[in-house]
């Protein structure tokens, strides 16, 4: 006889797993960069590469790409290399981070919503 396993809980990461946040992250990071005088034309694909280690590292990665580093190279920033290794000053990074936090705080749910099928999945797990 086959025994069915029953779980009492399921744990998910919200950002990028349950919720599709990439549009709001992209708009917010570009606006933060624009407000602080930096390159502000990053695509959703670029921004997907920037995030994963928090907003601070994402801002630093954007500044490194602005300096000419590849997405592959900046993937090491915040993991095995510091922002200083890419010539990113604390002053520049902190300005972008502050502008991002302020803008994203006001616009974090402009386009964010659950990925298709997520609500049905959660109801099924209930």
Regions from the PLM with identified roles:
Residues 118-126:
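Catalytic-core regions built around general acid/base machinery
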Residues 1-3:
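Eukaryotic N-terminal low-complexity, Ser/Thr- and Lys/Arg-rich leader segments
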């Amino acid at each position: 006889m086959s025994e069915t396993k029953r779980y009492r809980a399921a744990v998910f990461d919200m950002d990028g797993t349950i919720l599709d946040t990439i549009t709001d992250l992209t708009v917010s990071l570009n606006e933060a960069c624009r407000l602080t005088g930096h390159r502000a034309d990053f695509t959703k694909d670029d921004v997907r590469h920037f995030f994963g280690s928090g907003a601070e590292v994402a801002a630093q990665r954007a500044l490194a790409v602005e300096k000419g580093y590849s997405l592959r190279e900046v993937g090491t920033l915040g993991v095995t290399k510091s922002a200083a290794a890419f010539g990113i000053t604390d002053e520049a990074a902190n300005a972008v981070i502050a502008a991002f936090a302020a803008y994203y705080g006001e616009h974090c749910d402009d386009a964010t919503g659950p990925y298709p099928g997520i609500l049905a999945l959660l109801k099924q797990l209930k």
